[in-house]
Amino acid sequence: MAISKESKAQYFEKLRSLFEKYNSLFVVNIDNVSSQQMHTVRKQLRGTAELIMGKNTMIRRAMRGIINDMPELERLLPVVRGNVGFVFTNADLKEVRETIIANVIAAPARPNAIAPLDVFVPAGNTGMEPGKTSFFQALGIPTKITRGTIEITSDVHLVSKDAKVGPSEATLLNMLNISPFTYGMDVLTIYDQGNVFSPEILDVSEEDLIGHLLSAASIITAISLGANYPTILSVMHSVVNAYKNLVAVSLATEYTFEGTEQTKAFLADPSAFVVAAAPAAAAGGEAEAPAAEAAAEEEEESDEDMGFGLFD
């Protein structure tokens, strides 16, 4: 059914108003998403975000009409492909993403559908009558008859990820009441204030960023020191290393400066160190004696108090 010019104009105006109102949006894949799921997501996002759908050609045409005023939107054009929609928001991106991807439902396998994951049939009794054994044999599934029913003897990898589901595989899964797939909105790309990035970026925590920053700082410092090229990160280490070298040279030669005078004196006359350390040790002993006397006095006072009764 053809869309009228009036409807297109209204859609273009609606999209423009959303781009002007919101700073961020999610590009979401809506393959196999039911209308009921769409309604539920819209309801959960109400007051926080707005979901808009449309044909890709209409979305691109509307965006090209806005690019003159908002040139940063040109970065979004390449990601408008496939069965996608936009979720506009100014709220916390992580919270909105969780709401978008939380609404999923289990779905049966359909013939010719692309499997989003590997599908396994578990070992166990199927409850089916022996007459259907040939059906399992055709799919290469090992079985045996147990108490008049078919039993699968080992787990079977029935469908590989990204492969088409065959009619026989779909029939078997339905016969076993296995709904192997879950369908819901999938976030493909995030647009935020002119920047386009992968949704995995939202999973990077503040601790991860700090860890990467510290690791980078350590690497830069090591390279700077190794290349003897001073940087803000390495200059303190360079100064300390240079001072250590200067002290080593001073101790090995007759050159003396303020930082090595005392060390050289102690090395020349170790007994001077013993003499210098003695007053400090004596001062420590004198400080301990008054403390011991004070403790003894407190103990005596406590003992005297113990001799009085409540009404003495």
From Swiss-Prot:
Phosphorylated. Residues 295-306 have a biased composition (Acidic residues). One of its GO terms (molecular function) is structural constituent of ribosome. GO terms for biological process: cytoplasmic translation; cytoplasmic translational elongation; ribosome biogenesis. The modification Phosphoserine is found at residue 302. Disulfide bonds: none annotated. One of its GO terms (cellular component) is 90S preribosome. The keyword Zinc does not apply. PANTHER family: 60S ACIDIC RIBOSOMAL PROTEIN P0, LARGE RIBOSOMAL SUBUNIT PROTEIN UL10. Component of the large ribosomal subunit (LSU). Mature yeast ribosomes consist of a small (40S) and a large (60S) subunit. The 40S small subunit contains 1 molecule of ribosomal RNA (18S rRNA) and at least 33 different proteins. The large 60S subunit contains 3 rRNA molecules (25S, 5.8S and 5S rRNA) and at least 46 different proteins. The acidic ribosomal P-proteins form the stalk structure of the 60S subunit. They are organized as a pentameric complex in which uL10/P0 interacts with 2 heterodimers of P1 and P2 proteins. uL10 directly interacts with 28S rRNA. This is Large ribosomal subunit protein uL10. It comes from Schizosaccharomyces pombe (strain 972 / ATCC 24843).
